[in-house]
């Protein structure tokens, strides 16, 4: 049986992509995708990893050592952060004002955590007063989880004062920046964010398939001190950290 006439080379039609993602990709990026492959432990590839980390730190506005590009979509970044920072029985306050706040609550449940939902109408944001009241009422709380820019509605969540509030209650701050990173400032260090993830196919205007991710030393401390290993081997950030470590670069994926 021959497939010569049945299947032809795929030539995609030209589209002007105007949605939140995937977005248009610069021709220079498309050209880079046509270059020969390198092995994942090739010295040139390892040097490229250093460059990627430096550029992502600038994009996230952070000095976090653990700043990487995770293999997977933005949802993989979401699941990696939740699976590593939320353990069974942990309480996590999650802002639910759209599709992705709802997804975060679901992932917290699947990790054995106890999501405390603060709901707002779709298109609205989560008031900081509601976060403060819930942090006091539900203590101890492991983390506050918020979507910076809710893709399903376009709502932009103010974050400037949330990090300090979380620290006052010994809670981590987890932020979904899938739609916002590269489009508006994401001030990870200034805002006191402990874990932040994004996706390459939105405002960064890259092909999908990578999840930029950064975790503060405080967040990495919580991961290293887990009561049990992360239930996901593939998304275990303690293992992935060793692959991105400047000194060891131990193979993981």
Residue ranges and their predicted role:
Residues 189-201:
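Conserved active-site segment immediately N-terminal to the catalytic lysine
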Residues 65-93, 97, 101-105:
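Conserved beta-loop-alpha segment that forms the PLP phosphate-binding cup at the N-terminus of a helix
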Residues 103-114:
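Active-site-proximal loop->helix
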Residues 126-182, 195, 203:
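Active-site phosphate-binding strand-loop segment of PLP-dependent enzymes
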Residues 14-71, 75:
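A glycine-/small-polar-enriched, mobile loop at the entrance of the PLP active site in fold-type I
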Residues 24-25, 201-253:
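Active-site C-terminal subdomain of aminotransferase-like
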Residues 17-19, 68-71, 94, 117-118, ...:
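General beta-strand structural signal in soluble alpha/beta enzymes
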């Amino acid at each position: 049986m021959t497939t010569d006439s049945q299947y032809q080379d795929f030539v995609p039609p030209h589209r002007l992509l105007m949605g939140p993602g995937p977005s248009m990709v610069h021709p220079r990026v498309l050209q880079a995708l046509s270059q020969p492959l390198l092995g994942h432990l090739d010295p040139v590839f390892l040097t490229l990893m250093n460059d990627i980390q430096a550029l992502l730190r600038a994009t996230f506005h952070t000095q976090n050592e653990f700043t990487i590009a995770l293999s997977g979509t933005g949802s993989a970044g979401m699941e990696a952060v939740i699976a590593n920072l939320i353990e069974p029985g942990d309480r996590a306050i999650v802002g639910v004002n759209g599709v992705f706040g709802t997804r975060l609550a679901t992932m917290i449940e699947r990790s054995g955590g106890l999501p405390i939902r603060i709901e707002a109408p779709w298109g609205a944001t989560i008031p900081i007063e509601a976060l403060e009241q819930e942090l006091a009422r539900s203590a101890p709380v492991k983390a506050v989880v918020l979507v910076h820019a809710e893709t399903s509605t376009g709502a932009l969540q103010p974050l400037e004062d949330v990090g300090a509030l979380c620290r006052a209650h010994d809670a981590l701050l987890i932020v979904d920046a899938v739609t916002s990173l590269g489009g508006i400032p994401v001030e990870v260090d200034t805002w006191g964010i402990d874990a932040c993830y994004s996706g390459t196919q939105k405002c960064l205007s890259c092909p999908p398939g990578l999840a930029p991710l950064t975790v503060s030393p405080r967040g990495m401390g919580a991961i290293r001190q887990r009561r049990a290993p992360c239930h996901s081997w593939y998304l275990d950030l303690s293992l992935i950290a060793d692959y991105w470590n400047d000194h060891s670069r131990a193979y993981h994926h």
